[in-house]
Amino acid sequence: MGGGLIERYVAAMVLSAAGDTLGYFNGKWEFIRDGETIHQQLAQMGDLEAIDVARWRVSDDTVMHLATAEALMEAGQSPDLPRLYSLLAKHYRDCMGDMDGRAPGGACMQNAMLLQPNRADGYRIPFNSHEGGCGAAMRAMCIGLRFPHPSQLDLLIQVSIESGRMTHHHPTGYLGSLASALFTAYAVNGKSPWQWGKGLMEVLPEAKKYITQSGYFVKENLQHWSYFEKEWEKYLELRGILDGNSAPVFPQPFGVKERDQFYIDVSYSGWGGSSGHDAPMIAYDALLAAGDSWKELAHRAFFHGGDSDSTAAIAGCWWGVMYGFKGVNPANYEKLEYRQRLEEAGRALYSLGSKEDPVLDP
């Protein structure tokens, strides 16, 4: 573990945005479907260490992650959940005004504009069988910074699901939000990444119970529930970590080309990382292989032929919680867009998350 916990909270927010920025490259790399082409261009630039992000913009992922963080900050200590949800809805809707040149996803754009934060239950949208994308997963990591304590697991489940289904009311979408938040909390607690996947599988029945109890489009949600769970179980079996005790096993070779194919194989429609199940999965796969190497994390999670900025935003956050800024060239984040807001969010979330405060549920 690198640095004190405050520094690692700051690194979580900043390096998530750095990953997003690097994977996006002002829109040039997110949509290149061939990872080898990206890696060739990266090598011509002098590789990761040589990149100064001064003129590189964050994408929609970071704008929405900041929206989540700043809603949590505004809700303050011991918030009541309806107010927190209204604040999340407000921040999601408002941040749509900052999407020019950031390639926002369709579901996020359309549904955020439907949210009515000032009305009771105005944060709810109907179920939609086409909303399994990664837009909920890419913005939820900081929920795990806010509610990291094991005693707050039920809260983390509820807040990640409800924040996720404000734009992605489909289990494949909002369970990605749960995975992003849960793994962040695991990182805060120093839980070995080998155990994270097993932990997620144990939490999914609790999430299902919450969906049933919430009484909102229950039948539709349960009908579409199994895909996320089955895909994750298949992945954990493939890496040999379903038991939570074993070291992950990677194929040999597993270079850029092989990883691109693997990311296609785990995807829903052929664009790796673009769904709620595979964006955190690819980020997790990269983290397991990279250990404390920022460069190795980047090569696996930021620079590939899939939805690279989303997998990068998620992986960068988890890695930052674990290792702080250890071995990261300051040029990768010093002149980052919104760096001050990101640092402030990290410090504020540390202050809020360090106390096991109760949350008022009506």
Swiss-Prot record:
EC numbers, comma separated: 3.2.2.19
SUPFAM superfamilies linked: ADP-ribosylglycohydrolase
Annotated Mg(2+) 1 binding sites: 59-61, 309
Binding site for substrate: 90, 129, 135
Regulation: Synergistically stimulated by magnesium and dithiothreitol (DTT) in vitro.
Matches recorded under Pfam families: ADP_ribosyl_GH
A GO molecular-function descriptor: ADP-ribosylarginine hydrolase activity
Any one GO BP annotation for this protein: protein modification process
UniProt keyword terms in alphabetical order: Hydrolase, Magnesium, Metal-binding
Cofactor note: Binds 2 magnesium ions per subunit.
Superkingdom to which the source organism belongs: Eukaryota
Protein family per UniProt: Belongs to the ADP-ribosylglycohydrolase family.
Protein task: Specifically acts as an arginine mono-ADP-ribosylhydrolase by mediating the removal of mono-ADP-ribose attached to arginine residues on proteins.
PANTHER family attached to this UniProt entry: ADP-RIBOSYLGLYCOHYDROLASE, ADP-RIBOSYLHYDROLASE ARH1
Protein name per its UniProtKB record: ADP-ribosylhydrolase ARH1
Lineage of producing organism: Eukaryota, Metazoa, Chordata, Craniata, Vertebrata
